């Protein structure tokens, strides 16, 4: 369609967003006290609009543009790109409303997928397609939290630090000069220190007892 590009998928990440979408976890009916599997929800999408089927999941997409739609510069053919996972939703007049690839429209668990040209960004680096496909959702989520808290050189605690978002937050916070305490299982502590964590704490320990009151400037949770 006009303004879109056809992408040959070279790498697609798998993360909790894909699992949570299948469970209906993003439904407005789900709360902190809700057991997801006990709720039958028709509005399990990010924007509250029922997901239409069939649907191809895959929110993290790396690939090459092989065709362009009307209005898209033909020189984009051949570009290696990453697709922005969360995009402005045409179904809403609210500027903050969004749609997510692999949820409201088809994603990257296929040989080919379609995306808006202005949501497909050229990448020029020596990372593999698989490495690049790990970036969009986890790193954008972590970056959003760090920006919202304006993290710079503060001392921070990152919970769930061994997951995709947590490990991304470690690396991004380190680039900002933060001192990082990562909460994780003991067997994952050394790996997180290699990523940039200054200290680790056992996920099963009492944090106040181990760290003390008012011991960090911010918690990235």
Can you name each region flagged by the protein language model?
Residues 17-23, 91-92:
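Cytochrome P450 core scaffold surrounding the K-helix E-X-X-R motif
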Residues 44-54, 83-160:
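NAD(P)H dinucleotide-binding glycine-rich loop of Rossmann-like/cofactor-binding domains
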Residues 110, 153, 197, 215-217:
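Local beta-strand N-terminus motif with an aromatic residue
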Residues 127-205:
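Mid-domain Rossmann-like dinucleotide-binding core that forms the NAD(H)/NADP(H) cofactor-binding site
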């Amino acid at each position: 369609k006009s303004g879109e590009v056809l992408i040959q998928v070279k790498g697609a990440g798998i993360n909790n967003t894909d699992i949570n979408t299948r469970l209906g976890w993003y439904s407005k009916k789900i709360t902190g006290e809700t057991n997801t599997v006990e709720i039958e929800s028709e509005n399990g999408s990010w924007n509250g609009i029922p997901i239409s089927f069939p649907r191809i999941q895959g929110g993290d997409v790396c690939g090459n543009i092989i065709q362009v739609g009307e209005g898209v510069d033909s020189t984009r053919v051949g570009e290696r790109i990453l697709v922005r996972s969360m995009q402005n939703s045409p179904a809403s007049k609210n500027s903050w409303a969004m749609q997510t690839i692999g949820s409201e429209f088809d994603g990257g668990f296929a040989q080919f997928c379609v995306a808006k040209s202005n949501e497909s960004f050229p990448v020029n680096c020596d990372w593999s397609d698989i490495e690049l496909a790990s970036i969009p959702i986890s790193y954008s989520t972590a970056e959003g939290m760090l920006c919202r808290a304006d993290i710079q050189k503060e001392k921070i605690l990152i919970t769930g630090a061994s997951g995709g978002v947590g490990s991304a937050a470690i690396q991004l916070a380190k680039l900002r000069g933060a001192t990082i305490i990562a909460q994780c299982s003991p067997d994952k502590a050394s790996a997180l220190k290699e990523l940039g964590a200054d200290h680790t704490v056992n996920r099963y320990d009492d944090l106040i007892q181990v760290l003390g009151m008012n011991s960090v400037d911010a918690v990235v949770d």
